Amino acid sequence: MSRWLWPWSNCVKERVCRYLLQHYLGHFFQEHLSLDQLSLDLYKGSVALRDIHLETWSVNEFLRSMESPLELVEGFVSSIEVAVPWAALLTDHCTVCVSGLQLTLQPRQGSGPGAADSQSWASCMTTSLQLAQECLREGLPEPSEPPQPLEGLEMFAQTIETVLRRIKVTFLNTVVRVEHSLGDEDRSVAVEVRVQRLEYCDEAVRDPSQAPPVDVHQPPAFLHKLLQLSGVCLYFEELPSQADPPQPPLQIGSCTGYVELMVRLKQNEAFPGPKLEVSGQLGSLHLLLTPRQLQQLQRLLSAVNLADPAGLADKLNKSRPLGAEDLWLIEQDLNQQLQAGAVAESLSLYPITNPLNLDSTDLFFSMAGLTSSVTSAVSELSVYSVDLGSSVHSNMAFHRPSTPPHSGGKMAPTPLLDTTRPDSLVKMTLGGVSLTLLQTASPSSGPSDLPTHFFAEFDAAKDGPFGSRDFSHLRPRFQRACPCSHVRLTGTAVQLSWELRTGSHSRRTSSTEVHFGQLEVLECLWPRAATEPEYTEILSFPSHSGSEASARPCAHLRHTQTIRRVLKSRSRRSTACHCHSELSLDLADFQSDVELGSLDRLAALFRQVTTPSEPPAGLLTEPPQATELQTVFRLSAPRATLRLRFPIPDLRPDRDPWAGQAVRAEQLRLELSEPQFRSELNSGPGPPAPTRLELTCSDLQGIYEDGEKPPVPCLRVSKALNPRSTEAKYFLPQVVVTLNPQSSGTQWETAYEKGRDLELSTESPCELQQPEPSPFSSKRTMYETEEMVIPGDPEEMRTFQSRTLALSRCTLDVIMPSAHIFLPSKEVYESIYNRINNDLLMWEPADLLPTSSAAARPPGSSGFKMCKSAFKLDSDSDEEDAQFFSMASGVPQTPAPEPSRRQSQSTFSTLVTVLKGRITALCEAKDETGKRLDVTHGELVLDVEQGTIFSVAQYRGQPGLGYFCLEAEKAKLYHRAAIEDYLLPTHLEVPSFAPPAQLAPTIYPSEEGVTERGTLGRKGQGPPMLSAAVRIHLDPHKNVKEFLVTVRLHKATLRHYMAPPEQSWHSQLLDFLDVLDDPVLGYLPPTVITVLHTHLFSCAVDYRPLYLPVRVLVTAETFTLSSNIVMDTSTFLLRFILDDSALYLSDKCEVESLDLRRDYVCVLDIDLLELVIKTWKGSTEGRLSQPLFELRCSNNVVHVHSCADSCALLVNLLQYLTSSGDLHPPPRPPSPTEIAGQKLSESPASLPSCLPVETALINQRDLTDALLDTERRGLQELAQSSGGPLPQASPVSVYLFPGERSGAQAPLPPPGASSHTLGSKAKEHENEEEGDGDTLDSDEFCILDAPGLGIAPRDGEPIVTQLHPGPIIVHDGHFSQPLGSTDLLRAPAHFPVPSSRVVLREVSFIWHLYGGRDFGLHPTYRARVGLTGPRVSPSRSSGPNRPQNSWRTQGGIGRQHQVLMEIQLSKVSFQHEVYPEESAIAGGLGQELDERPLSRQVLIVQELEIRDRLATSKINKFLHLHTSERLPRRTHSNMLTIKALHVAPTSSVGGPECCLRVSMMPLRLNVDQDALFFLKDFFTSLAASINPMVPGDTSEAPRETHSRPGSPQEGQSEDTETASNPPEAPGSSHSSSDQQPIYFREFRFTSEVPICLDYHGKHVTVDQVGTFMGLLIGLAQLNCSELKLKRLCCRHGLLGVDKVLCYALNEWLQDIRKNQLPGLLGGVGPMHSVVQLFQGFRDLLWLPIEQYRKDGRLIRGLQRGAASFGSSTASAALELSNRLVQAIQATAETVYDILSPASPVSRSLQDKRSSRKLRRGQQPADLREGMAKAYDAVREGILDTAQTICDVASRGHEQKGLTGAVGGVIRQLPPTVVKPIIVATEATSNVLGGMRNQILPDAHKDHALKWRLEEAQD
C-alpha cells in the first residue's frame, strides 16, 4: 500500500471526483455533471453542490427497483459538500455532508411489492475492481487496438475499496414528508419526519480493528453500516382545501436521547441469517395524537402497504411450475382421498379445529378441491410451522421422504420441509415510550398550543423522564404537559423485534415481539373547571413497581402475520390472499379498573380512531378482490385483579358527559387466577362471521369494598372436576361474549329473498306453521275460563334459548363450575343490589360524539329491502334484517320500516350456567316483638345443582320486551333462625356442598319414598326441580311495566318448623330481600304490574312436632298460586288452587326416612280446593268500603279417612298447631307423691264447677229471680242521677266470673233488648225461619212485630182483629225488588263493613269412619277391636271385605275396612266476619247502633248424610233429609244453618257476647244396632284419646285478643289484673283468663224439626248398658217413629258450648218424655201401619164434618176424606198384608231348610239363587213391575225345583245307581211340597209391594234410601 502514496495528479483527482458524483448521484439530478461544472478545492479536497433538484422519474425507478411502497413527488437538496482527505486518504475518512434534504413522498399506486431482494439495498455499490477500471478508462480516447491490462489495477481497486469503507455521510436538517389523499375528499394529510442530524458510516469507521481485510475478488459476506440520529421529530399536517388558509404542521412525536441503528446486510446467500438486519437503541419516544390524527395515520399506513397481497400473489403466480413438494402433496392428497372413510370417522369422534382456516385446495392449479381432506390442512400447518433457521441453504434440493409404515390402519402424513427463510430482522431497544391519545379532537381545556407545550415539557428534562422504576413521578409532569382528558400508555425498557420471512407457496410471515419492562395504561380525565385530574388505571402492574421490581418483563406482546396466496381462478372466492394474524399478550400480575364511563369513552375513542369501510359504488358493481383476514388474539397472565367501579347513572338529557368520573365509593374487586383471554376476528368475502370473546380462569374471588368499611368476600368461583372424563380434566370458569353481525342487503340476498317469497306464495294457506319458541309451555292448561301459564319443559326451554342466542346481536355466556356467593348482612346485600341493579343495569352511555343522522348513516346502508313486500314478514328469509350496532362505524344503523319480528335480532342475551352453586345469607334475628337480637343472626343457605339463568333484552327487536328464565336440576334450602355471631371469613373457600352443620334442611328434593308417582322415563328426563320464566314488557307511552312470572317446583319437600312469626324462614328471607331502591337521576320508575303463576307439582310438606309423637306429611300433586300485583294500588289478589292433595300421619318418629305407602296413613284427601285472598290497604279517610282482608275457599270434595286413634291424633295435631306447641314445651308431669298430696289438700271450693244440667238451670233461674229486684232498684238510682234513659235489666250481670273480686262493684249491665237494638234486630230479622223451618234471609224485609197473633181458640176458628180502620193503601215500590239470588251468607245492610272476612263456599266433606286402629304395636289385637263379638250376627259376620278404591284408603294394618261409616256434608258454606273497632265505625253509623258488633259467623250445610257401610248392616243411609208429600224438598233449602253474632258488652268489664241461632230441616234416621254401637264406641274412644288443652308458659304464650267476661281487656294493664286477683298457690293451675269459653247471651233454635226414626235391633247386649236396656235395645224394632225437636229460645245466658248443648238436649228430652211418647211408640213393630189404618177411617168420617163447619163445602170434605183414606188405610192394609205374607214366607223357608236334605248343592244352582236373592231385595216401583217380578218368581221357583230334583237324582245315580236315584228323589219330596208356598208368598209379596208403592210413591223412595243394594255391599 505504501507504494501508492505518491502525489495525486489534478487530472486524476478531477476524474475521480466527477466520476464519483456522476456515478452515485448523477442520474438523480436533473443536470448532468461534467468536469467543467465541478468547482474543486484540490488543496483541501472538497467539493460543494447547492440547490439541487432531484429527478423524480429516476428516483422513482430506483425506488421501484427496490420495491418500495413509496414514490417521490418532489425532492430538493440545499447543499452537498464532499470532503476527501487526499493527504491521508487511506487513514482518514471521506465525508459527505447533505444539508436541507427535503423529500416529498406519496404511496405508490399500482401493484404492491413482493419479496424484495435485500441485495438491492447494496446494488448501488459495485465492486471496487470494476470501479477502478471504469474510472481509469473514462475520459481517455478510444484506442485503435484492444487495451492491455493496466498494471496495478488490483492495487488501485483495493485502494478504492479501502476509501469506500471509510466514507462518512452526514445529513443535516433532513425532512421526509409523506402525503396521502383521502379518497374522494378534498383534504389530504401529510406526515413529516424531521431529523436534525443523521450520520451514516461503516462499522470500520468506529472500530477499525474489527474491519475484515480487503479482498477485491471475494467481497465480505456481511456489510455493517451504522446510523446515528439525533433531534428526530414527527409532525402531522392536514392539508386544507384551496379555499382554506394553510396551517403549520403540528408536532405529534419526538425522540429524545441518542438514536443509533446498526444495519447488517448479507451479501452471500450461503451464509445463514436474514438478508437485512437492523438493530438499534432509542432513548425515549413520546407521541401526542388526537383521535382524528390517529385515524388519518391509520389510513396512511394502510395505503403504505409493505406487503400488498395482490402484488405478492401476482408476482408469485406468474409461471410457477409444479415443484417436487407440489407433486408430493398431490400424491399425499390422493392417498388420503382413498382413505376418506376412515379419516372422516376418526375426525367425527375428535374434531380438529383449524385456527388458520387454511384450505389445501389453494396450493395448486391442477387440483379441483380437497374438501374432505382435513388432514391435508393439518399437514400444511405442520409444513408452515417448521423453521429452518440459518442452517439450510437456499439452493437445497427437496426429496420426498420415505413413507412410514402403517399403524392402526391409517397413515400419518409426513410433514413437508418448509422453505421459508428469514428476509429482514429489526431489533430495537427503547428506554421509554409514551403515547398520549387525546379523547377529543379539539380539547377545550389546556393551552392553545398544546403540542408545543407538551413536547417542550419533556425536552426540558435532561436526564430523561424514565429514570424511576414506577410511573408515579411522571403524573405531575404529564399534568403540566397535557392538562386535558386523554388516554396514556407509558412503558419503559421496551424491546422491539420484527422479522420478515418469505418462502415458497406464496407465503410471507412477519412476526413482531415487544417486551415491556414496565407498562401502564391510564385514562386521565380532566373535568371542567378542575385543578386535578381523575385517573383510571386501565392496565397497571403494581408488583413491578418500586424497589422490588422483577427483572422479568411485565408484558410480552407477540404478533405473527402469515400471508399466503389464494388462486384467482376459483369462482367460489373473490379473495386474492389469505391473511392470518396471531396476537399474543403475556402479562405479569396486573390490575385494571373497569368503569363503564371509561369504557364508554374508550369506545367513543375507538369509533373515532377506526376507519369506516368504504361501501361499494353500486349494487351491480363487482366487488374488488378482498383479503380474507383472520386475527386470533390471546392474553394470559398468572393473576389479574379487576376493580369494578360502579357508575352513578344519570338519565337526564342535559347531563354533561365530560363532568368527571361519576362513580360510587363502593367497588367490587375481582381476583382471577390464571386468566386467559382469546378472541378471533374474521373478515372477508361472504357473510360476516360472529366475533367470539372468551375468558377463562382457574379461580375467581370477588371482594366487595365499601369505603372505609372492611372488605367483604362475596364471591368465589373455582374449577370443578369433570366426572365424565377419565383423564381428570376440569371444568374451568368461562365467560364468552359473542357478537353476531348483521348481513347487509346485497344483490344476492335480495335475489334469494325474492325466490323465497315466490316459493312461499305457492304454499297451502291451510298449512299450520311451527309455533314460535317460547319459555312458556305450549300445552294449554285451563282453569274455568282462565289460562294457566306454566314454564316450558326442558326441551322447550332449550329450543327458546338456543334460538334466541342465535338471533341476538350480543350474547354473554357464563359458566361457573363451582360458585359460592356470601352475603354477610342485609346492608351489604342492599348495597350490592343497588350497585348492580340500579347503577350497572340502569347506566346508559353518554352522547360523547353528537353527530347528525345524515352524517352518521353510511351511504348505502338502507338497502333495497325497503321496497320488500310485507306478504311474508315471518319467513325465515328475513333473518338478517334486524338493526345492528356496527363496531366499525359506531352508529346504530337505521332499521327497516317494519322489520320482521320473527327474524329480527335481539339486542342482548345472557346465559349463566352454574354446575354447583351455594348462596349464604346472614339475616337479622328478631324476637316476637320485632326487636333485633344482639350477638345472634339468622342464616340461610341455598345450594343449586345444574342451574341456568337466561335473560334476553329487546327480544326480536322490540324495545320493551324481554324474557328471564331460571332452571335448576336440584335446589336445597337450609335455615336457622338464630345462630351466635362468628368472625366473618377473610376470603371464601371452595364449598364442599355438604349440608351445613348448624342449619336445618328446609326445602330439598323429595325422597324416593315420599313422592306418590314415580319418575316417568329414564333418569334425567324429567323436568327440573325448579324452573321459572318471566316475561317483561314495558309500555313507554303509558310508563307501565308488566311482569308475567311463572314458577314451577317439581318434587320438592318443605320441612316445616314451627317458629315465631319473625323467625320463620320465609319471614327472614322476605325481610332480607326487602330492600329499598336508590333513586336514579332522570328516571321515572314505571308502574309495575306483576302477574304471578306458581305451580308446585308432586311436592310435599314434612312436619315433625317436637312434643307430639307423630310425623305429618302433606302432599300435593298440583298446587297453583296466581296473583296480580300492582304497585301503588290498594288491592291485592292472590289465588291458590290445590289439586289431588293428601295429609298423612305416622307414629314412627324414630326413623329418619320413611316410605309413604308403607309407613304413613292417609287421613285427609282433598280433590280440588281453591283459595282466593284479597287484601285492601284502606282509604285515606279511614272509612272502610270493603274488607281489608278477605279469604274465599271452595272445593268439590274433601275426604277424611280415619279410625278413632288416627282421628284423635289429627285432632291433637290441630290443637297442637293452633296452640303453637313447638314453642311452648309441655309442663313436667307431676310425681305420684305430688298427685296424692294435691288430692288430700283439695277443698270443696276447688272441686269442678261443672254441675248437672238441671241443677245449673235451677240455680240460674233462682239467682235471676232473687237479684232482679235489687238490680232494678240500683239501675233506677243510677239512671236518675245521670239523667239518662232507664235501661232494661239483663240477667248477664248476675254472674261473677273468675278474676272478679267478690266485694267489687257489679259492672253496669248492658241495655235491655229493646226493639231498636242490634241484638233484637238480629233476632227479629230471622223470624221467618220459625214458620216453616227454612232459612230464607232477606236484606230488605225486617219484621219488627206481628200484632194480633195470639192463642188460637179451641175450636180452631180464626178471629179477625181489625188494626186500622179504613181502606188499606198500597204503595208501589215500597219494598225494593232484589236483584238476583239472595246471598245467605251476607250480613244485613245496616251492619258495618267488616275489616276481615273468611268465606267458604260449597265445600263438601266426607268423613270415613273405620273400625280398628291405624297405629299401635299389636296388629292382632287391633284386628279384634270393633264389632267382633256378641254384637255381630252369625249369619252376617262372614261378609267379604270392601274393595279398596285407592291405596290411600288402606290406612294402618289394624284398620277394619268392613267396619265403615261415612258422614257427608255437601256444599258447606261458612263465613266469618270481623268488624272494625268502634272508632272506625263511629262516624259511619252514628247513633243507629247501641251495641257494637265484633264478629259474625254463618254456617250453612245444604245436605247432611250419614251412610252406613258396615258389612253387618243392610242400612244404606243412617241419616238423611226427610221429605214426603207433606214435607216436600224445597229448591234452595239448607239442611243446617247456624248463625252467630258476637257483640261487645256495654260494660267496661267482660268479653264478647254471642247471639246464636240454629235452624235445621226435617231428618230421617235409619238406625242399625251395630252402626249405633260403632258410632258410640268410635266417639267414646275419640274423646278419650284427645289430649286436653294444657296451657303453656304464660310468659311465652301470647294473650288472646278476646276473652270471656271478667277477663282484662286490651287497654287494661297487667298490673291491674294482678291486683284484682288474689295470689294463687304455687301448685295451683294458671288462671283461665287466657282461654275463656264463649258467653252466649242468647240461644235460639228457630225451627221445629220433625224426625222420622227407624230402628232395627239385632242382638241383646247386657255387658255395657245393663240387662233391661240391653233387652230393649236388642229386641226393639221401630218403624216410622215420629219425633220433633221443638223451638228453643234461651235469653238467660249460657257460658260455653257445652252448656248450650246440655241445655238443648235437656229441653228436647224433657219435651219428648212429656209430649212425644205416643208418636215414638207408634212406630214399634206394626203399630205404624195400624195407626195409619185407623187414621184413614177417622179422616174419612171427620174431614167432611170439619170442612162443613169451616166453610160449608161438604163435597170438598168428602174428597179430602176419601183421599186420606186411600193413602193411609189402603197403604196400611197393604203393608200389613205384606208383613203377614212375608212372615208366612219366612216360616216356609225355615220349614224348607229343616226338611231339605244335607246333600250339597251344585255351584250353578247357588249362583242362580244368589242372583234371585239380589233381585228379590229390590222392591217393585209399581203394580206392573210387581206382577212381572211375581211371574219371574213363580217361573224361577218351578225351574229351581225341577233342577234340584234332577241334580239329586243324577248325583244318587252316580253314587248308588237306581236305588240311589230313587232315594234321593224321595228325600227331596218334603221340601218340594213346601217350595210352592215359598214361591207363592214371594209372588204375593211382590204384587202387594207394587200396589203399595203405586198408591204411596214416597214409600218406594224411602225404601231405596234406607236399604242398601246388595251389589253395593259386595
Curated annotation (Swiss-Prot):
| Transport listed as a keyword | yes
Q: Name one GO biological process term.
A: positive regulation of autophagosome assembly
Instruction: List the GO terms this entry assigns under cellular component, sorted alphabetically.
Output: endoplasmic reticulum membrane; lipid droplet; organelle membrane contact site; phagophore assembly site membrane
A Pfam family that this protein carries is ATG2_CAD
- Regions of biased composition (Low complexity) lie at 1429-1446
Q: Where are the transmembrane segments?
A: none
Q: Which domain of life is it from?
A: Eukaryota
Q: Which InterPro entries match?
A: ATG2
Q: Where found in the cell?
A: Preautophagosomal structure membrane; Lipid droplet; Endoplasmic reticulum membrane
Q: Which reaction does it catalyse?
A: a 1,2-diacyl-sn-glycero-3-phospho-L-serine(in) = a 1,2-diacyl-sn-glycero-3-phospho-L-serine(out); a 1,2-diacyl-sn-glycero-3-phosphoethanolamine(in) = a 1,2-diacyl-sn-glycero-3-phosphoethanolamine(out)
Q: Does the keyword Membrane apply?
A: yes
Q: Name one GO molecular function term.
A: lipid transfer activity
Q: According to the UniProt record, where is the region WIPI-interacting?
A: 1337-1383
Its biological purpose is as follows: Lipid transfer protein involved in autophagosome assembly. Tethers the edge of the isolation membrane (IM) to the endoplasmic reticulum (ER) and mediates direct lipid transfer from ER to IM for IM expansion. Binds to the ER exit site (ERES), which is the membrane source for autophagosome formation, and extracts phospholipids from the membrane source and transfers them to ATG9 (ATG9A or ATG9B) to the IM for membrane expansion. Lipid transfer activity is enhanced by WIPI1 and WDR45/WIPI4, which promote ATG2A-association with phosphatidylinositol 3-monophosphate (PI3P)-containing membranes.
Q: Hey, which family's this protein in?
A: Belongs to the ATG2 family.
Q: Share the domain note from the entry.
A: The chorein N-terminal domain mediates lipid transfer activity.
How is this protein named in the record?
A: Autophagy-related protein 2 homolog A
Please give the organism.
Answer: Mus musculus
